[in-house]
């Protein structure tokens, strides 16, 4: 598989004819241009494929890849090339992105930053321009979502370039158990996710030691952490065969873990993420050298998190005003922490739930609908 070609090459020769003042203004304009270009780069993301209508994604290979791949919002040049080559993969890239976004929102549902999406191709807004631990989690869980979706699509025969898993038989599998079936092709899912997701970072060129180069290294590390988490959590699944459920024979195969398990593991990594900085050789190193170096499965970040308590257009924080909170909780979902000490308002709402359920022979459950008035609390 060919590597995407880098597209950013900001080498510019400056003439001297205009004098010192002209050169000064030219340099200022150039700096402004690249600052704007960086914002544009960060503002567009392949994550937007997870926000599209599924019909639009499936049309990529029905109508023909050439025009649609160029029109898909958020793809870098390298990712567009991969779209042209692997038309049938794009629907599952979108499914993987959607899986990652949903898992992010589940894991952070009780946090001040709750992985909210915005209505543009950045998906998460300006907050992703900050190299925070929240950004680290988002990159990791999105990359993990792509591995998950691609591996499953291979197993289900949806892709022309892969099929069932060819993973080697585990050494600890009992000798009388058969290794076969059609397992999730995690090897292929991992490789393609790496090629596609990392393409944007690898084609960006920035000066060694710059903030932008540190962000690239951070993003690549967290992408890999997400992929590795899916890979390492995959396990052997087995099915019994035999007369009357005797299980005299077992067939086993490699199977993806439930994605909630992946999200839980990455959330733990988020809580213990390592603060990093660039050293003189242009490598990421820990800010606190007394701690163990992060592994390939750990998350890393280079910026402190912004204040998520109040709305801030420059950082992308939406604030917590209007968020529901739990009056009795002392955790992050509690009104004291969620509302950042601003207090909360109380209102009553009507909830309808299934109740008084009974099992009827044979074979259904019949329930009544019960309504109750409950108190809810929202941050001021």
Curated annotation (Swiss-Prot):
For this protein, what post-translational modification is recorded in UniProt? Answer: Glycosylation is necessary for secretion but not for activity. Palmitoleoylation is required for efficient binding to frizzled receptors. Depalmitoleoylation leads to Wnt signaling pathway inhibition.
For this entry, list what GO says about its biological process: anterior/posterior axis specification, embryo; anterior/posterior pattern specification; atrial septum development; axis elongation; axon extension involved in axon guidance; axon guidance; axonogenesis; BMP signaling pathway
Q: Which Pfam families match?
A: wnt (PF00110)
List, in alphabetical order, the Gene Ontology terms for molecular function in this entry.
Answer: chemoattractant activity involved in axon guidance; cytokine activity; frizzled binding; protein domain specific binding; receptor tyrosine kinase-like orphan receptor binding; signaling receptor binding
Entry-linked CDD domains: Wnt_Wnt5a (cd19347)
Extract the PROSITE patterns matched here.
WNT1
Instruction: Provide the residue ranges of the propeptide in this protein.
Output: 38-61
Q: Where in the cell is it found?
A: Secreted, Extracellular space, Extracellular matrix; Secreted
Q: Lipidation sites of kind O-palmitoleoyl serine? A: 244
One Gene Ontology cellular component term attached to this UniProt record is:
extracellular matrix
Keyword Transmembrane helix in record: no
- Spell out the coiled coil positions from the record: none
This molecule's function is given as: Ligand for members of the frizzled family of seven transmembrane receptors. Can activate or inhibit canonical Wnt signaling, depending on receptor context. In the presence of FZD4, activates beta-catenin signaling. In the presence of ROR2, inhibits the canonical Wnt pathway by promoting beta-catenin degradation through a GSK3-independent pathway which involves down-regulation of beta-catenin-induced reporter gene expression. Suppression of the canonical pathway allows chondrogenesis to occur and inhibits tumor formation. Stimulates cell migration.
Subunit-structure text: Forms a soluble 1:1 complex with AFM; this prevents oligomerization and is required for prolonged biological activity. The complex with AFM may represent the physiological form in body fluids. Homooligomer; disulfide-linked, leading to inactivation (in vitro). Interacts with PORCN. Interacts with WLS. Interacts with glypican GCP3. Interacts with PKD1 (via extracellular domain). Interacts with TMEM67.
Name by which UniProt lists this protein: Protein Wnt-5a
